[in-house]
């Protein structure tokens, strides 16, 4: 084979070797970053390291006293989490249902004395970072898709039948003991037809067998809610 034919083959071999080395190095850097982050989160003297992947079910009620154009609701929620061993960061899938406790209305008029039901699916990620031995910061970002069910007055579009929005939660978490944590934070982003809840306060208690109990209280302008959640590790 002549030198003119050998040259393209040699260049191709060098290019393949270079790409392989670059891929290996990029993969190594990525693995090193994740390994270092996980090592830092798991070895720090941060309480509640026993959190593990779990299924969480919750029930709550919302009281809306903004006026006769708004309704109270009962809420049911289920969440499946996939977290790191330290429980500090991970991903989740969320399913929810909210039903009005009396005839639904809107700011523009009644919805023909019909209860309103909201079914939702969503998913997101959360992160918890240590700041001090007993203090940490948390953040959560999720995207939700809702389907509304109600009787619509003929020719009038008061509420959407479907809606999608993103929501963020962030705040500070105080670790009172190895099993108890208190949190205070803000809620941003949600559908206009939902109660305008802005602040969130919670108490989390770790039970035996990688289970947990959470009580949440949320507030907004003339709106308040409470929620109890039970998580079971697997």
Name each region found by the language model.
Residues 20-90, 96-101:
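Short glycine/proline- and aromatic-enriched beta-strand/turn motifs that initiate or cap beta-hairpins
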Residues 118-189:
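Detector for outer-membrane/organellar transmembrane beta-barrel domains
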Residues 1-8:
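Bacterial N-terminal signal peptides that target proteins for export
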Residues 61-69, 99-118, 147-164:
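Flexible, solvent-exposed loop segments that connect beta-strands
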Residues 71-77, 118-122, 165-169, 196-198, ...:
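Transmembrane beta-barrel architecture of outer-membrane proteins
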Residues 199-201, 222-234:
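Outer-membrane beta-barrel "beta-signal"
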Residues 48-51, 83-89, 128-134, 144, ...:
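Outer-membrane beta-barrel channels and translocator barrels
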Residues 27, 53-63, 91-95, 137-144, ...:
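Transmembrane beta-strand segments that form the barrel wall of outer-membrane beta-barrel proteins
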